[in-house]
Swiss-Prot record:
Lineage: Bacteria, Pseudomonadati, Thermodesulfobacteriota, Desulfovibrionia, Desulfovibrionales
Keyword hit for RNA-binding: yes
Gene3D superfamilies listed in its UniProt record: Ribosomal protein L25, beta domain (2.170.120.20), Ribosomal Protein L25, Chain P (2.40.240.10)
Stored InterPro entries: Rbsml_bL25/Gln-tRNA_synth_N, Ribosomal_bL25/Gln-tRNA_synth, Ribosomal_bL25_b-dom, Ribosomal_bL25_C, Ribosomal_bL25_long, Ribosomal_L25_dom, Ribosomal_uL5_bac-type
Protein name as annotated: Large ribosomal subunit protein bL25
Disulfide bonds, paired cysteine numbers: none
Keyword line: Ribonucleoprotein, Ribosomal protein, RNA-binding, rRNA-binding
Homology family: Belongs to the bacterial ribosomal protein bL25 family. CTC subfamily.
A biological process from GO: translation
Protein task: This is one of the proteins that binds to the 5S RNA in the ribosome where it forms part of the central protuberance.
GO annotation, cellular component aspect: cytosolic large ribosomal subunit
Quaternary structure note: Part of the 50S ribosomal subunit; part of the 5S rRNA/L5/L18/L25 subcomplex. Contacts the 5S rRNA. Binds to the 5S rRNA independently of L5 and L18.
């Protein structure tokens, strides 16, 4: 297992809109860390490190969050949970982090990536994508950052469903039925 990336944050005292506005004026991002035991800690962090970390790990990869509470530091495995963006400036305005237990499965929405050109599309069929992400359950360190689906052998009238996905060991889809992910259909007017 490779070393987890770490984000250093500070516990914040000021709460509410006014305090958060003052933080943003100093190019800090307010947030909340919800630990695995259910406690929440209001935090603040520098903008650049959190942006770089988000680019590197996204919403599906676990990392360590180091909380500095007036000199007392504690480190916890975490995931990005909810992110609010500034409506104009396209930067973070508030971030919630979710603490995780590395031994317990978590549920996360994982993006799907489609590769290759389907055989059915090459002969005139139309590719229809029904889902672009899927809820996945796995231990945090086994969670895939994306699920890659090869479309090369997909012919007209064929479908790739949830049960057809290459999920790997310890990873399962959270779905109550075997719904379609992607299909190649006949062009309009043909059967």
């Amino acid at each position: 297992m490779s070393e987890l990336k770490t984000l250093s944050v500070r516990k914040r005292d000021g709460l509410g809109k006014g305090a958060n506005r003052k933080l943003r004026a100093k190019t800090l991002v307010p947030g909340v860390f919800y630990n695995a035991e259910g406690l929440n800690v209001p935090i603040e962090m520098d903008t650049l490190p959190v942006e770089k970390l988000f680019e590197a790990v996204g919403r599906t990869t676990v990392f360590n969050i180091e909380v500095d509470d007036n000199g007392t530091k504690s480190t916890h495995p975490a995931l990005f949970w909810q992110i609010q963006y500034h409506p104009v400036k396209n930067r973070f305005s508030h971030i919630d982090f979710r603490g995780v237990d590395l031994e317990k499965p978590v549920k996360i929405r994982v993006p799907l990536e489609f590769t290759g050109t389907a055989k059915g599309v090459k002969v005139g069929g139309k590719l229809e994508v029904y889902r672009e992400a899927l809820d996945i359950s796995a231990k945090p360190l086994q969670m895939p950052s994306k699920i890659t689906i090869d479309l090369t052998d997909l012919e007209i009238g064929k479908t790739i469903s949830v049960n057809d996905l290459p999920l790997g060991e310890g990873v399962c889809a959270v779905a109550d039925r075997n719904f379609a992910i992607v299909a190649v259909v006949s062009p309009k007017g043909e059967e």
